[in-house]
Amino acid sequence: VGRVIRAYKFLMRPTVGQTIALGEMLRDHCSLYNGALQERRDAYRHVSKTSVKYGMQSAQLKEIRAFDPERQGRWSFSSQQATLRRLDKAMQAFFRRVKSGGTPGHPRFRGVNWFDTVDFPKDGDGCRWDSTPHDPVTRVRFQGIGHVRVNRHRQVVGKVKTVSVKREGRRWYVVLTAEQVLPHPLPATGSVVGIDMGIVSFLTTSGGEHVANPRHGRAAAAKLEAAQQALSRCQRRSNRRQKAADKVAALHRGVRRRRLDHAHKTALGLVRKHDFIAHEDLKIRNMSAAPAPKPDPGKPGAFLSNGAAAKAALNRSIADAGWGVFLTILNAKAESAGREVMAVDPRNTSRRCPECGHTAKENRPTQETFRCVSCGHQAHADAVGALNVLRAGLVRREAQPA
């Protein structure tokens, strides 16, 4: 029987005392993270190039907790191990970038206001989901904090595996991961579709259907700009500045939620209608990378225009569309529904004629128009791209071993 891991996120309703304790828990885990990072930095910079591993730092936890029982000794041992694993993962990524010749970017120290998550690797070890089952109100218990009320708006299916505390502005959330049996697949429809992601239209299907791009970030840009300007004028560490910061956070939170809502609804519509969905294997990070500077050979120290301003506008539009989030949601929904999703190479999908197969840059005279210079076929460029994506996906599916 197939099993999947699904995440649930619920708003917590802590008391005043619990809110203070949750903040102290984040503060102390942040201190542990920074202390462990300092030890690793010192070892890396030492002439001996000593390597500090996770096991060595985890073995020190018992001594650290005994030395500081009021702070480090107050919290779950397992959650502190998870924080050290988090640092270890960042360090491994750093050394991997060093070996590959990329830009290393050493892990940085975290400010207490920039450390917003504490993980509990196992339900029942330092935490307990639904800790008062006899009570109609759902609660989650954390070591050192107590039973915190939870606004459970949906049922949790399966066995809870991990629990995390997350702070967003002044709100507190509990995030669960649960292992559950794959549900029964949706009835087959016999339909297949290819999708072409875009900016003007959020996506275009191989059938010629266009899904509008809501541009949530652009719609909220004026309000965000005004709120951020008001924030910049406030005196630091004042109540007025805190209120202004809360307003900026609320606007960003609203944009993020609307973007997620649109992604969920669009993905659900595709999964319900089609048995097979092909999409472009987009390298979004590469697409939104800043252009390299162009030195001026005639003026040492000067640079020529490299189109950075126009590229920045395109990058904002790509981020606003949220392609990566949408594709992640689409894959998760398809897995639960028993549908098949396949990523294909996007090269030349919008330049290849679906009628005669001729591929040329001249086939696309404008952003929206496709006109084959060989056979004269005309169509919307995004619809042509989606159709070629579908055909490539079907070919790849047929080539896969049974």
Spans of features found by a protein language model:
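Gly/serine-rich nucleotide phosphate-binding loop at the start of the catalytic core
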Residues: 1-79
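Positively charged, helix-rich recognition surfaces that bind polyanionic ligands
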Residues: 6-9, 20, 141, 152-161, ...
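Alpha-helical coiled-coil heptad-repeat segments used for dimerization/assembly
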Residues: 24, 31, 42, 89, ...
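Stable alpha-helical structural segments in soluble proteins, enriched in small hydrophobic residues
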Residues: 36, 83-90, 94, 383-393
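Long, hydrophobic, amphipathic alpha-helical segments used as structural scaffolds
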Residues: 37-44, 91, 95-102, 180, ...
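Acidic carboxylate diad motif detector
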Residues: 55-166, 304, 310, 316, ...
